[in-house]
């Protein structure tokens, strides 16, 4: 199987989907690997480093001729022209956010594997490290944009406690998963007060136990509680993600209007559509805008801003799946590996993820029925 590692075109995206070390694992297993020129530069990997591990450096167009194209984020619209029948595209594709790309993949007969929907032992195994990074960075960005020169309230989120008692900021975090706890931990490290809004009762108990000795309040998620707590936020971070599907707009414009002027609002799951009515995707180079008096931060690829860290994390997670596909062929790998099967969102043009199908009102096919 010919495997290609392509350079990301998304603005500000410095990650690469495969490290030189992982290229060596593929070539040692007898697979041919081509790497687009400068694909790894943003993560600190030169073309020579890939060549030394057995890869061939190629152009953008040549890379897209491969049987298996390994990416970080969804293909750019300029890359749709390279799609070909039965080609496999791997990455954090977040297809629920764009019907256009789904329809193009269906038209051509592409197979799309989305790392964020791979579930192993009940957990989003590949997404978790990226969620952790996004959560931590969101807390930092909240502090940064709280400063007056960025349009924020002009507050220091840590407060001041040398001979005075100026309280720190309040972070309200919507959701209680991996991204949420990582955001909370950074906020606590900054001496901020944290409120977590969570729906699941078991998770609420877990969070209460986890933060029993910390300045954290855990609140049951209801529309009424959300509306009440958001008013307290100096920084509001939404972490809600529904695997494979576009989430509902749970944070309404009226709720945003009720927030403090100059407060900061961040939606980590904006790459899947987001849960905030007033949010829209932004970029790492132009990350914020003001609406209803609130600073909105809508960067969909936050880990791309710290590529040296995040590339190592994602590459460690995806290589075993990629090797299995290459060694066995996709169909046998899907049959043998239930977790991998959950990542197949589109198989040869047929939608095989129920959340994705419902998001775009498309027909859904069970993956194991399709490949039999």
Curated annotation (Swiss-Prot):
Its EC number is 1.4.1.1. The active site is at 94. It catalyses: L-alanine + NAD(+) + H2O = pyruvate + NH4(+) + NADH + H(+). NAD(+) binds at residues 170-200. Pathway: Amino-acid degradation; L-alanine degradation via dehydrogenase pathway; NH(3) and pyruvate from L-alanine: step 1/1. SMART domains: AlaDh_PNT_C, AlaDh_PNT_N. It is an enzyme of class 1 (oxidoreductase). SUPFAM superfamilies: Formate/glycerate dehydrogenase catalytic domain-like, NAD(P)-binding Rossmann-fold domains. InterPro entries: Ala_DH, Ala_DH/PNT_CS2, AlaDH/PNT_CS1, AlaDH/PNT_N, AlaDH/PNT_NAD(H)-bd, NAD(P)-bd_dom_sf. One of its GO terms (biological process) is L-alanine catabolic process. The keyword Oxidoreductase applies. Keywords: NAD, Oxidoreductase. GO terms for molecular function: alanine dehydrogenase activity. It comes from the Bacteria. May play a role in cell wall synthesis as L-alanine is an important constituent of the peptidoglycan layer. Belongs to the AlaDH/PNT family. This is Alanine dehydrogenase 1. It comes from Staphylococcus aureus (strain NCTC 8325 / PS 47). The gene is ald1.
């Amino acid at each position: 199987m010919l495997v290609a590692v392509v350079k990301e075109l998304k603005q500000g995206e410095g990650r690469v989907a495969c490290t030189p070390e992982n290229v060596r694992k593929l070539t040692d297993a007898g697979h041919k690997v081509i790497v687009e020129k400068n694909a790894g530069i943003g993560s600190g990997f030169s073309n020579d480093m890939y060549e030394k591990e057995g890869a061939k450096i190629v152009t953008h167009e040549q890379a897209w001729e491969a049987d298996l194209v390994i990416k970080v984020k969804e293909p750019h619209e300029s890359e749709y022209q390279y799609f070909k029948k039965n080609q496999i595209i791997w990455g954090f594709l977040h297809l629920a956010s764009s019907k256009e790309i789904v329809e193009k993949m269906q038209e051509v007969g592409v197979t799309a594997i989305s790392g964020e929907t791979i579930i192993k032992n009940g957990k989003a195994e590949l997404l978790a490290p990226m969620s952790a990074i996004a959560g931590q960075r969101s807390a930092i960005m909240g502090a940064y944009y709280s400063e007056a020169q960025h349009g924020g309230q002009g507050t220091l989120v840590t407060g001041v406690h040398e001979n005075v008692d100026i309280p720190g900021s309040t972070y309200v975090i919507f959701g209680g998963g991996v991204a949420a706890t990582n955001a909370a931990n950074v906020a606590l490290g900054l001496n901020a007060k944290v409120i977590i809004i969570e729906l699941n009762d078991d998770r609420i108990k877990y969070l209460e136990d986890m933060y029993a000795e910390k300045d954290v309040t855990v609140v049951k998620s209801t529309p009424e509680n959300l509306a009440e707590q958001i008013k307290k936020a100096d920084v509001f971070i939404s972490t809600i993600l529904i695997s494979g599907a576009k989430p509902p707009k749970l944070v309404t414009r009226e709720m945003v209007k009720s927030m403090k002027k100059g407060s900061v609002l961040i939606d980590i799951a904006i790459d899947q559509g987001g849960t905030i009515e007033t949010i829209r995707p932004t970029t790492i180079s132009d990350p914020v805008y003001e609406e209803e008096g609130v600073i909105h931060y809508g960067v969909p690829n936050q880990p791309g801003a710290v590529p040296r860290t995040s590339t190592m994390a994602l590459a460690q997670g995806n290589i075993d799946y990629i090797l299995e596909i290459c060694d066995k062929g996709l169909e046998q790998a899907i049959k043998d590996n239930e977790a991998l099967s959950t990542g197949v969102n589109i198989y040869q043009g047929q939608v095989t993820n129920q959340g994705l199908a419902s998001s775009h009102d498309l027909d859904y096919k069970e993956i194991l029925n399709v490949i039999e």
